[in-house]
């Protein structure tokens, strides 16, 4: 489903800002070291200006009801001075590429979108330049051309673009009177699994490092981002496992002997993001929820806490931490699940436990 908003929320835009400055951080021993992490910018006035300019550009060209924005499971990139845009719904498995310009602009956007790489750090969603072409396209095996071929180079992508422009070109009228020319591309039926398998080596590595179930990591990744490495949310959660720098990020830094919090570029790197998300699961298990005895009950609590926080989970059972643990340990794992799925004050958290538990089942035997 396409997602439109009249105004682009500041918190949706900010996570895509590039953090280029280099800073020093302090290790647990007090030694100054060169850090690969940057701190969140304090120049909110500058960010407000950039956000306003970006929003104004889109409103002025497409109309106030046509501002399509990126989200956890949606990639959106504007090009050609904002007259062309590509939208990938990783949840629905649908790619829409549209332009207010001519077919050459549409062709170019098709090619660059299909051949873009997997590293979000090389993509600036604020400027209207083309996405760099990669020798290892992220969408490879997720999209097939008219002959069933994987789209892995410019020649195949250009041939497929010609096919789309000749056979599947459509138009629609905007409220401002302009005409949009567009094409839609369906991803393969198992596109979610194809993306998941891209991260199998990393997930196995982090699962072993922190003693977390592979299936749990995959289940959370699917629900959080549908394996969209470009993912960002309204809460400034970033990447595949939707890590929030100022909360989970700070906890993770403490355990790594670092000060501050990770920057967006760091968390957009898949290996870093999966490491951070999995470490946070281990923190929940070993520290915040360590008083739960039954491993299945603890898993349910961990899942719910990943979404709403450990404190909120314990308060479902009792306002007192010790009493909450005692109450949980008196219940069967099925009963713990029912309580969290029905009595948690957050509807999102209630649904989250159900979604992750179901998604996790699909990855128990992944090879």
Curated annotation (Swiss-Prot):
Subcellular location: Cell outer membrane
Gene Ontology process terms (BP): cell wall macromolecule catabolic process; cell wall organization; peptidoglycan metabolic process
Keyword Kinase: no
Catalytic reactions of this protein: Exolytic cleavage of the (1->4)-beta-glycosidic linkage between N-acetylmuramic acid (MurNAc) and N-acetylglucosamine (GlcNAc) residues in peptidoglycan, from either the reducing or the non-reducing ends of the peptidoglycan chains, with concomitant formation of a 1,6-anhydrobond in the MurNAc residue
Parts of the chain that traverse the membrane: none
GO-annotated cellular components: cell outer membrane
Signal peptide (from-to): 1-19
N-palmitoyl cysteine-type lipidated residues: 20
Pfam families attached to this UniProt entry: Mltc_N (PF11873), SLT (PF01464)
HAMAP family per record: MltC
PANTHER family in the cross-refs: MEMBRANE-BOUND LYTIC MUREIN TRANSGLYCOSYLASE C, SOLUBLE LYTIC MUREIN TRANSGLYCOSYLASE-RELATED
Protein name: Membrane-bound lytic murein transglycosylase C
Organism, as annotated: Haemophilus ducreyi (strain 35000HP / ATCC 700724)
Gene: mltC
């Amino acid at each position: 489903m396409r997602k439109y908003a009249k105004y682009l929320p500041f918190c949706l835009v900010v996570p895509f800002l590039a953090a280029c400055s280099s800073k020093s951080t302090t290790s647990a021993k007090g030694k100054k070291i060169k850090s690969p992490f940057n701190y969140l910018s304090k120049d909110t006035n500058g960010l407000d200006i950039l956000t306003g300019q970006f929003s104004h550009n889109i409103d002025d060209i497409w109309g106030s009801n046509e501002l399509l924005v990126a989200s956890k499971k949606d990639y959106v990139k504007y090009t050609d001075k904002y007259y062309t845009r590509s939208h990938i719904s990783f949840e629905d498995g649908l790619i829409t590429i549209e332009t207010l310009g001519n077919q050459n602009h549409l062709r170019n956007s098709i090619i660059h979108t299909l051949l873009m790489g997997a590293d979000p750090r090389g993509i600036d969603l604020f400027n209207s330049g083309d996405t760099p072409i990669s020798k290892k396209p992220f969408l490879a095996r997720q999209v097939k051309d008219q002959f069933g071929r994987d789209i892995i180079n410019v020649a195949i992508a250009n041939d497929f673009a010609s096919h789309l422009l000749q056979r599947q070109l459509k138009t629609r009228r905007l409220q401002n009177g302009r005409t949009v020319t567009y094409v839609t591309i369906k991803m393969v039926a198992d596109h979610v699994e194809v993306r998941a398998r891209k991260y199998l080596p990393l997930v196995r590595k982090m699962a072993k490092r922190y003693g977390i179930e592979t299936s749990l990591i995959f289940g959370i990744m699917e629900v959080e981002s549908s394996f969209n490495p470009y993912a960002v949310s309204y809460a400034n959660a970033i990447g595949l496992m939707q890590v929030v720098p100022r909360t989970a990020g700070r906890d993770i830094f403490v355990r790594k002997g670092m000060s501050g919090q990770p920057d967006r570029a760091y968390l957009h790197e898949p290996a870093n993001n999966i490491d951070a998300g999995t470490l946070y699961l281990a923190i929940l298990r070993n520290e915040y929820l360590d008083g739960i005895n039954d491993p299945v009950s603890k898993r349910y609590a961990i899942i719910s806490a990943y979404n709403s926080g450990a404190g909120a989970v314990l308060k479902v059972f009792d306002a007192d931490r010790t009493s909450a643990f005692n109450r949980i340990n008196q219940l069967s794992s099925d009963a713990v699940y029912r309580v969290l799925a029905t009595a948690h004050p957050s509807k999102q958290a209630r649904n989250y436990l159900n979604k992750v538990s179901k998604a996790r089942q699909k990855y128990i035997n992944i090879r």
